[in-house]
Swiss-Prot record:
<dbReference type="InterPro" id="IPR037118">
    <property type="entry name" value="Val-tRNA_synth_C_sf"/>
</dbReference>
<comment type="function">
    <text>Catalyzes the attachment of valine to tRNA(Val). As ValRS can inadvertently accommodate and process structurally similar amino acids such as threonine, to avoid such errors, it has a 'posttransfer' editing activity that hydrolyzes mischarged Thr-tRNA(Val) in a tRNA-dependent manner.</text>
</comment>
<keyword id="KW-0030">Aminoacyl-tRNA synthetase</keyword>
<dbReference type="GO" id="GO:0002161">
    <property type="term" value="F:aminoacyl-tRNA deacylase activity"/>
</dbReference>
<dbReference type="InterPro" id="IPR009008">
    <property type="entry name" value="Val/Leu/Ile-tRNA-synth_edit"/>
</dbReference>
<keyword id="KW-0067">ATP-binding</keyword>
<dbReference type="InterPro" id="IPR014729">
    <property type="entry name" value="Rossmann-like_a/b/a_fold"/>
</dbReference>
<protein>
    <recommendedName>
        <fullName>Valine--tRNA ligase</fullName>
        <ecNumber>6.1.1.9</ecNumber>
    </recommendedName>
</protein>
<dbReference type="GO" id="GO:0004832">
    <property type="term" value="F:valine-tRNA ligase activity"/>
</dbReference>
<feature type="binding site">
    <location>
        <position position="557"/>
    </location>
    <ligand>
        <name>ATP</name>
    </ligand>
</feature>
<feature type="short sequence motif" description="'HIGH' region">
    <location>
        <begin position="42"/>
        <end position="52"/>
    </location>
</feature>
<keyword id="KW-0963">Cytoplasm</keyword>
<dbReference type="GO" id="GO:0006438">
    <property type="term" value="P:valyl-tRNA aminoacylation"/>
</dbReference>
<dbReference type="GO" id="GO:0005829">
    <property type="term" value="C:cytosol"/>
</dbReference>
<dbReference type="InterPro" id="IPR001412">
    <property type="entry name" value="aa-tRNA-synth_I_CS"/>
</dbReference>
<feature type="coiled-coil region">
    <location>
        <begin position="884"/>
        <end position="953"/>
    </location>
</feature>
<comment type="similarity">
    <text>Belongs to the class-I aminoacyl-tRNA synthetase family. ValS type 1 subfamily.</text>
</comment>
């Protein structure tokens, strides 16, 4: 082994060897249990971020552990075509490089351009996955628009249409006026804005008056421009001010339209004026009110969100309607929506109908990619009827076929699924799965897998002109088929039979509705087992939290707090990091602030920590479902942990290579207490590690490894071996070498799922020294399981006593400022014969590690001079102090410590007795101060006791 641990020199070469040797593939032995995980397919446009690194570490740890248990494991990898994101990347590229738009290319040529781009640049994220050590089967890599998944997507659409579970309708959607497409709620980003609430007078028709004699009512709105499409005003049916007006009419200013006043609980008596204008074609809440009261829907906006020359009027079913005429005032024709807002407010003012304007805090929805305010828009779209699909998906979770970890996410799932809305699946894009529907010249729609199939099924002659729908399917539609579409469905392939359902889905809670729920619905509808029962896509849903920065803020480019996992693996210089965070910003004005923050937080850039340290940090912070505040200090700490394991392994190899390790049959072995103890402690660690993985507690599994490797194996056991290796008999040395190398080999196997590279690298040096170890890689060795035969509770108790003895001596040295190297004569009053036997059996170890000249066991009533004392279990350990220390100097030092401690106690008591401080300070601050006070009070008691002991010398 190299002298120093250098992850850069081992990681990439090892991964290449693993991949080329085919170790990531399922072993194919169908007599063994199968275990599969389907990776959430990252966007093909993307690059690895901390969320990916976190989830991929969890999945790889689980897959590696199950592979080591002998299971036939598949970690299915692939990428998502990411419709809107990919189309925008390529549109920006051709605009920047060629000054062209997609329309200059035309649909087919532009799609070819995207495929070209994917071939050149779409592999970034898969290259980065390799850097994380992800043991996915690359030969099975899939893409959501490859031939197989495209065929599966088409098949699902056609079958759902034939079952009347897909329909086309005119409904309200989130419309991006810049990108000209419907977008999902997940692609809508709400922004807080300062705005206004305008109060308009709406005149009552037919001479009607309000209860207080006015001939108008006042409506409050944040969107004056939409009043051109108003078809009603809602008041609360319980509101005494307006309930008599229900059924009466308003004469809408500017357009002169007569619209009804309706009673609806959507109108809040205590909010605004209590009267709400209803624009069903331009507001989601109004759309629902309109449906309840059969109000027509009037669309006043173009797809650019400009005012139309003539409105479109529809009934509540989206059919064209002549309830109102379609005229709009000529001066507003073609006017941009926000310009129209100003003009309409001005006209209300001129008409004397502007009652007042108030400042108002708004939450405005923006398209996260187009960057403009989205518009609720009435458009023709394709929808999935989700209620029939949701019922069995709810039951599967209720019955425990699918379990959520943590369990509380079930409630979020149920809340959404029990009130599920139909799903808009069409998008006005070119890149994606084109909807398999064709129209004739009369607008009649035909659905089929191909145009030929449509013609044959419907007896359409070749002279009948058919035009395919221009829209593509929502990316989430094809993603919903991921667990079974990747395994060859609709064919009943061996892969589908072997690896479906998958074991666990590791996902963020933010896509529980967009992806998790839809996968469950689609899979249960289309995939059946041999008995014809619906199959679930996975048995467990493991919900992770988000990775946030050290202050708990979400990582985002605009905040300049994004950390690239690859930079933590390879390191990055400060100037390069500043350029990475500040270059190509959507809001360049933030660059100076971000540069300042970056220079302060990363003065020397980021040093290379290696993949294993990053993985271990992510695992150790993975408490289920909770957000993680990233901490570079913990990353540094776990890199030190990797160093510790490396150096400990070097110590083991230096003491075992070219030595007799007792592997020969019949070799004489005399195991020390420490040998037996570390063997027992390993069994405890193996038991805990496996239990934590089974419960998806990777944080606790990582902590088990840390505690065993650092504290027990390195800090204690290796130290305890030194006296034996220096002074023991041949049989004792042989047994200790045997224990060193076998426990290290087992430890490497136990740690491998989280720390793949360092464990493989060390294991290759350890393997030749351990009898019976076969195979070329640690990846296919057995994951250690608890073996009761190797655990001895009495041994553990004895060694814990030895540790307590040594620790007590070390603590007394520190308390009384006695040099660690100074030999001491100690005495002990033993509580029972057991402790006396422990001293006798372990005298060499105790004197060696505690640096003692002698240990004297005192007779029952034997008197002693003044001593420093400490309890070891129930026995009393004593160090005679005469001549060990300068009495006067030590008392003077202790007096100073006492005075300092008393000062701190007085200061904190003053704070806590100050009513002003207690009233204003947060509870957490007060608790901290109380804890500090308790700590200082305990210290004072110890100092006074030390003074008493020394004064008596």
């Amino acid at each position: 082994m190299e002298k120093t641990y250098n992850p850069q020199s081992i990681e990439q070469a090892l991964y290449q060897r693993w991949e080329e040797a085919g170790y990531f593939k399922p072993h194919g032995d169908t007599s063994k249990d199968a275990y599969s995980i389907m990776i959430p397919p990252p966007n093909v446009t993307g690059s690895l971020h901390m969320g990916h690194a976190f989830q991929d570490t969890i999945m790889d740890t689980l897959i590696r552990a199950e592979r080591m248990k002998g299971k036939n494991t598949l970690w299915q990898v692939g990428t998502d075509h990411a419709g809107i994101a990919t189309q925008m990347v390529v549109e920006r590229k051709i605009a920047a490089e060629e000054g062209k738009t997609k329309h200059d290319y035309g649909r087919d040529a532009f799609i070819d351009k995207i495929w070209e781009w994917k071939a050149e640049s779409g592999g970034t994220i898969t290259k980065q996955l390799r850097r994380l050590g992800a043991s996915v089967d690359w030969d099975r890599e899939r893409f959501t628009m490859d031939d197989g998944l495209s065929a599966a997507t088409q098949e699902v659409f056609v079958r759902l249409f034939e079952e009347d579970l897909i329909y086309r309708g005119k409904r309200l959607v989130n419309w991006d006026p810049k990108l000209h497409t419907a977008i999902s709620d997940l692609e809508v980003e709400s922004k807080d804005k300062k705005g206004f609430m305008w109060h308009f007078r709406y005149p009552l028709a037919d001479g009607v008056k309000t209860a207080d004699g006015k001939d108008y009512i006042v409506v409050a709105t944040t969107r004056p421009e939409t009043m051109l499409g108003d078809t009603g005003v809602a008041v609360n049916p319980e509101d005494p001010r307006y309930k008599d007006l229900i059924g009466k009419q308003i004469k809408l200013p500017i357009v002169g339209r007569l619209i009804p006043i309706v009673g609806d609980e959507h109108a809040d008596m205590d909010k605004g004026t209590g009267c709400v204008k209803i624009t069903p074609a331009h507001d989601f809440n109004d759309y629902e009110v309109g449906k309840r009261h059969s109000l027509p829907m009037i669309n006043i906006l173009t797809f650019n969100a400009d005012i139309r020359d003539a409105a479109e009027v529809f009934d509540t079913n989206g059919e064209a309607n002549d309830a109102y005429n379609s005229e709009l005032p000529a001066k507003y024709h073609g006017m941009e929506r926000f310009a129209a807002r100003k003009a309409i407010v001005a006209e209300f003012d001129e008409l004397g109908l502007l009652e007042e304007v108030k400042d108002h805090d708004l939450t405005v929805p923006y398209g996260d990619r187009g960057g403009v305010a989205i518009e609720p828009m009435l458009t023709d779209q394709w929808y999935v009827r989700t209620a029939p699909l949701a019922a069995p998906a709810v039951k599967a979770v209720e019955d425990g076929q699918i379990q959520f970890v943590p369990k509380q996410y079930e409630n979020m799932y149920f809340a959404w699924m029990r009130d599920v809305q139909d799903w808009c699946i069409s998008r006005q894009l070119w890149w994606g799965h084109r909807i398999p529907a064709w129209y004739d010249n009369y607008g009649k729609v035909y659905v089929g897998r191909t145009e030929d199939e449509v013609r044959e099924k419907n007896n359409l002659a070749s002279v009948v002109v058919l035009r395919q729908d221009d829209d593509v399917l929502d990316t989430w539609f094809s993603s919903a088929l991921w667990t079974f579409g990747t395994q060859g469905w609709p064919e009943n392939t061996d892969a589908l039979k072997t690896f479906h359902p998958s074991e666990v889905l590791v996902s963020g809670f933010d896509i529980i509705f967009f992806w998790v729920a839809r996968m469950i619905m689609m899979t249960m509808h289309f995939v059946k087992d041999e008995e014809g029962n619906a199959q679930v896509p996975f048995k467990t849903v493991y919900m992770t939290g988000l990775i946030r920065d050290e202050n708990g803020d979400k990582m985002s480019k605009s905040k300049g707090n994004v950390l690239d996992p690859i930079d933590m693996i390879d390191g990055i210089g400060l100037e390069e990091l500043v350029e990475k965070r500040c270059g190509n910003m959507m809001q360049p004005k933030l660059a100076a602030k971000i540069e300042k923050q970056t220079r302060k937080a990363f003065e020397g850039g980021i040093e290379p920590y290696g993949t294993d340290a990053l993985r271990f940090t992510l695992a150790a912070m993975a408490s289920t479902g909770r957000d993680i505040n990233w901490d570079m200090k913990r990353l540094e700490g776990y890199r030190n942990f990797c160093n510790k394991l490396w150096n400990a392994s070097r110590y083991v190899l230096m003491n075992t290579e070219e030595h007799d390790c007792g592997m020969a049959e019949g070799a004489e072995l005399e195991f020390s207490l420490a040998d037996q103890w570390i063997t027992s402690q390993f069994e405890v660690a193996a038991k805990e590690f496996n239990a934590h993985l089974d419960n998806y507690r990777l944080d606790m599994a990582a902590n088990t490894l840390y505690e065993f490797i650092w504290n027990q194996f390195c800090d204690w056991y290796l130290e305890l071996t030194k006296p034996v290796l220096w002074k023991g008999t041949e049989a004792q040395q042989r047994a200790t070498r045997y224990t060193l190398i076998t426990v290290l080999e087992k430890t490497l196997r136990l740690a491998h799922p989280i720390l793949p590279y360092i464990t493989e690298s060390i294991w290759q040096s350890v393997k030749p020294l351990v009898d019976g170890v076969e195979g070329e890689t640690i990846m296919t060795q057995a994951l250690p399981q608890f073996n009761e035969d190797n655990f001895n509770a009495d041994v553990v108790a004895d060694l814990e006593w030895v540790k307590a003895f040594i620790t007590s001596i070390r603590n007394l040295r520190a308390e009384y400022d006695i040099a660690p190297s100074k030999g001491l004569d100690v005495m002990i009053k033993v509580a029972d014969e057991k402790d006396a036997a422990r001293i006798q059996a372990n005298e060499i170890v105790l004197t060696s590690l505690a640096k003692l000249d002698s240990i004297k066991v005192l007779a029952k009533n034997e008197e002693t001079q003044a001593c420093a004392t400490s309890l070891v279990g129930k026995s009393e350990l004593m160090i005679p102090m005469a001549g060990l220390i300068d009495k006067d100097a030590e008392l003077a030092r202790l007096d100073k410590e006492v005075a300092k401690t008393q000062g701190e106690i007085k200061r904190i008591e003053g704070k806590l007795n100050n009513q002003g401080f207690v009233a204003k300070a947060p509870e957490v601050v007060i608790t901290k101060e109380r804890e500090k006070l308790e700590g200082y009070q305990e210290t004072l008691v110890k100092l006074e006791a030390q003074k008493e002991t020394i004064a008596a010398l």
